[in-house]
Amino acid sequence: MSRRHAAEKRVILPDMKYNSILLSRFINNIMKKGKKALAEKIVYSAFNKIEKKHRVDPYQTFNNAMHNVKPHLEVTSVRVGGANYQVPTHVDERRGYALASRWIINAASKRSEKMMIDKLAEELFEASNNRGVAIKKKEDTHKMAEANKAFSHFSPKKMQ
């Protein structure tokens, strides 16, 4: 590891349609091989599908989904005296949203619908209603942290 100062956080421009940095990050996570226009088309088409099918505000649905899937605790592996312990730690907001978007995208891609637009639309709608595979992933992460609560005194970061 380098001993120099930590790399600066890059400034991400908000997306054109909703002027949201969170949505812009989500689009960047959807993107493969630098095809940002295709990623934007997938996300905005999924938003249109949510609006037509469920008659709700798609941007509000997206925000609810991200908020519902965002974890508050996770486990990190800490080596103490030759043994590895899974220590529960708090997740900061930026990492929480990064995990949430990754989990939603992975859950959507594993769905049975034919097109990614349909998969993403359904997963976002389910996550906004506290259902779906992404929500289960969050609950499993919290259960793991709760099960390893006894090792929280090994925490590398102070738990608040």
Swiss-Prot record:
Keywords: Ribonucleoprotein, Ribosomal protein, RNA-binding, rRNA-binding, tRNA-binding. One of its GO terms (biological process) is translation. Pfam families: Ribosomal_S7 (PF00177). The keyword RNA-binding applies. The keyword tRNA-binding applies. GO terms for molecular function: rRNA binding; structural constituent of ribosome; tRNA binding. GO terms for cellular component: small ribosomal subunit. Part of the 30S ribosomal subunit. Contacts proteins S9 and S11. One of the primary rRNA binding proteins, it binds directly to 16S rRNA where it nucleates assembly of the head domain of the 30S subunit. Is located at the subunit interface close to the decoding center, probably blocks exit of the E-site tRNA. Belongs to the universal ribosomal protein uS7 family. NCBIfam families: rpsG_bact. This is Small ribosomal subunit protein uS7. It comes from Rickettsia akari (strain Hartford). The gene is rpsG.
